[in-house]
């Protein structure tokens, strides 16, 4: 297959001038030339999804550009890389081609929202979550393409768009990028980003105050609604009932619905079948954990955005160490930079590696250090920390202190109990188990634990 052709190259240059940058980079640039015979131009898209999207949305535009260049009518047909590979045993498998495709950051002409539009857009969107900052890899290519398609043409084919994937993989980023894109294109667009928890709280508040009419107006009179963490609808029967009717009202009016979840619709439990059916009626796109190449690109992009310089071997070390999600990866980057800045140590693998150990404090610390650091961090006195107080702020700080002491010292459970005012070893065991559970589901707890670990690391390093 000839991938470079003078005519297709000219057509691409023409389209580059007329299409938006994100449209060109996402749909036109990846298309490869296959053949041009008898006025028939055959192009190869990376996958079936891209092929179908090009056919439905860009065929006439490409044919018009080709006609202007060739001087006669040109018909364009699209095939996917996968279909081409079936016709030739010498072709590589599509999955291999996608995995080996160089990961790149997606450019967007509407990345940084203008200050004028920011002030008119009180919709809860995080200004950092734009397409420009999203690094596209094999793990997220489909979800990214679907998000862009919805941003460009809301309320059409992919309605709803259901984005699913594990914690910290970029679901919220893509959702909010759609919102930013629409607001930049149309400053008057009514865009609403909301977590399922907030939606639930609003419904409860509406019931208590007899104000459901206002709640319905709030959520049903929008052009684009972005619903995050829909899995938290599980078991909430009345909220599900309200969301069902809200979904129907939005869909019937042509408003775009984008939903995010930690699992696909068919794996959600405790949610009405009629809702599951509606979640599945549009497009479902999942995001997988990023591969090594993508993780490296993410760190390089973050370093560029933060105007920081990290040695390549340190970037590769972090990328190889933190593999499960992007949030954890970027957190490691931030901690490495902060650690080197505070301690004055060089940015090398040797100096940073111990601090980035996700399973331990990294150096042995004393029980007193743990108690003092937890006390300072949570603004709880040491006397309260080792007392029997059951106030939530105190008990939570105490549990985290017990967890850190278990992983940062060589003390047994009974000895840890002694350090916390003579608590029973079963109390210590329960506290550790509770923290371990929360670490996987509560980003706030995970962040608090990690920050205290880093502070303990810094203190210990200063004393070496």
Curated annotation (Swiss-Prot):
Residues 341-464 are annotated as: Domain IV, binds dsDNA. InterPro entries: AAA+_ATPase (IPR003593), Chromosome_initiator_DnaA (IPR001957), Chromosome_initiator_DnaA-like (IPR020591), Chromosome_initiator_DnaA_CS (IPR018312), DnaA_C (IPR013159), DnaA_dom (IPR013317), DnaA_N_dom (IPR024633), DnaA_N_sf (IPR038454). ATP binds at residues 168, 170-172. Residues 100-120 are annotated as: Disordered. Residues 105-120 have a biased composition (Polar residues). It comes from Prochlorococcus marinus (strain MIT 9301). Keywords: ATP-binding, Cytoplasm, DNA replication, DNA-binding, Lipid-binding, Nucleotide-binding. This is Chromosomal replication initiator protein DnaA. Pfam families: Bac_DnaA, Bac_DnaA_C, DnaA_N. Residues 124-340 are annotated as: Domain III, AAA+ region.
